[in-house]
C-alpha cells in the first residue's frame, strides 16, 4: 500500500539549521501548518533524544491553523562527523473524534494512517570559529611578537635615562680628577713651603720639625687616598652602566 502523503506543511522543509558556538543551548524553530479542513495530530521524533529538547513535541493542530515548534540543541562538543547522525521526523495523522488521551491515540493508530516528513540537522559555525587552528595561531603570534618587542621598547625607554646618568658620572669623574690634580699640586707646594719654613726656624735635625712635616704630609695623603677610593668607585659604576 502506498504511503499517505504528508498533509502538514513544514518550514523549513528539509533542514534544521543550528548556528554555533555550541557551548550554550541553540534554538531553531519549525513551523507546522495544517492547510486541511480537519484537525491533525502530530509528534516530533529525533534520532538523538538526549541532545534535544522539543517544545511542544506533540499535539493537535486545528484545521487551517499553524504551530511553531522550538527545537533546542543542548550544549555539546562539536564534532563534524556527528552531524549526520542527527535527524528529525514529523509524524502526523488526522485526529479522531476523541483526542483526550493522545498516548492511546498513537498506540491505536494504523500504519496506513500515519504520515511523516524527515529533516536533517545542519550545524553552522561562526566565521571566527570556522578555523580554530588559524584562530589559535593568530592569538599566539601577536603574543609572541609583543613579548619580543617588549624588551626593545623597555630599552628605548630606559636608554635616555642611562645616557643621562653616564654623562653625570663622567662629569663627576672629570671634576674628581681635577680635584686630585689640584690637591697633588697643593701638597707639593705645601711640602716646599713647610720645608723652607722649618729649615729657617730650626735646625734640620730637630725632632719637632720632622714631626710637623710628617703630620701635614699624612693629612694630605689621607685626603688623596679618600679621593682615589672615590674615583675607583665611580669607575666601577661607569663600568656597570656601560655593560
Swiss-Prot record:
Cross-link Glycyl lysine isopeptide (Lys-Gly) (interchain with G-Cter in SUMO1) per UniProt, renumbered positions: 147
Principal place of residence: endoplasmic reticulum
Residue positions where N-acetylalanine is found in the record: 2
Residues forming coiled coils: 161-196
Domain MSP: 7-124
Residue ranges, Cytoplasmic side: 2-218
Modification type Phosphoserine: residues: 146, 156, 159, 206
Membrane topology designation: Single-pass type IV membrane protein
Keyword terms of this UniProt record: Acetylation, Coiled coil, Endoplasmic reticulum, Isopeptide bond, Membrane, Phosphoprotein, Transmembrane, Transmembrane helix, Ubl conjugation, Unfolded protein response
Highest taxon above the source species: Eukaryota
Pfam families noted in UniProt: Motile_Sperm (PF00635)
Site, as annotated: Involved in binding the phosphorylated serine of the phospho-FFAT motif: 43
GO biological process: intracellular calcium ion homeostasis; IRE1-mediated unfolded protein response
Transmembrane annotation, as ranges: 219-239
Annotated InterPro entries: Ig-like_fold, MSP_dom, PapD-like_sf, VAP
Family according to the record: Belongs to the VAMP-associated protein (VAP) (TC 9.B.17) family.
Subunit structure comment from the entry: Homodimer, and heterodimer with VAPA. Interacts with VAMP1 and VAMP2. Interacts (via MSP domain) with ZFYVE27. Interacts with RMDN3. Interacts with KIF5A in a ZFYVE27-dependent manner. Interacts (via MSP domain) with STARD3 (via phospho-FFAT motif). Interacts with STARD3NL (via FFAT motif). Interacts with CERT1. Interacts with PLEKHA3 and SACM1L to form a ternary complex. Interacts with VPS13A (via FFAT motif).
Note on domains (UniProt): The MSP domain binds the FFAT motif of many proteins.
Official protein name in the record: Vesicle-associated membrane protein-associated protein B
Amino acid at each position: 500500500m502506498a504511503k499517505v502523503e504528508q498533509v502538514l506543511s513544514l518550514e523549513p522543509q528539509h533542514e534544521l539549521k543550528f548556528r554555533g558556538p555550541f557551548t550554550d543551548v541553540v534554538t531553531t524553530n519549525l513551523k507546522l501548518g495544517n492547510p486541511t479542513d480537519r484537525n491533525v495530530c502530530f509528534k516530533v521524533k529525533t534520532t538523538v533524544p538526549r541532545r534535544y529538547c522539543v517544545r511542544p513535541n506533540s499535539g493537535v493542530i486545528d484545521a487551517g491553523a499553524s504551530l511553531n515548534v522550538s527545537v533546542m540543541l543542548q550544549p555539546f562538543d562539536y564534532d563534524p562527523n556527528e552531524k549526520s547522525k542527527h535527524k528529525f521526523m514529523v509524524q502526523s495523522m488526522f485526529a479522531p473524534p476523541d483526542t483526550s488521551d493522545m498516548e492511546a491515540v498513537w498506540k491505536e493508530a494504523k500504519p496506513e494512517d500515519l504520515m511523516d516528513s524527515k529533516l536533517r540537522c545542519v550545524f553552522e559555525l561562526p566565521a571566527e570559529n570556522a578555523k580554530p587552528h588559524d584562530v589559535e595561531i593568530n592569538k599566539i603570534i601577536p603574543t609572541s611578537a609583543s613579548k619580543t618587542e617588549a624588551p626593545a621598547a623597555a630599552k628605548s625607554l630606559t636608554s635616555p635615562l642611562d645616557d643621562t646618568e653616564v654623562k653625570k658620572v663622567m662629569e663627576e669623574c672629570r671634576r674628581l680628577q681635577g680635584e686630585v690634580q689640584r690637591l697633588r699640586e697643593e701638597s707639593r707646594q705645601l711640602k716646599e713651603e713647610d720645608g723652607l719654613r722649618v729649615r729657617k726656624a730650626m735646625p734640620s735635625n730637630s725632632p719637632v720639625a720632622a714631626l710637623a712635616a710628617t703630620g701635614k704630609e699624612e693629612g694630605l695623603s689621607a685626603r688623596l687616598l679618600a679621593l682615589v677610593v672615590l674615583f675607583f668607585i665611580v669607575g666601577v659604576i661607569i663600568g656597570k652602566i656601560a655593560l
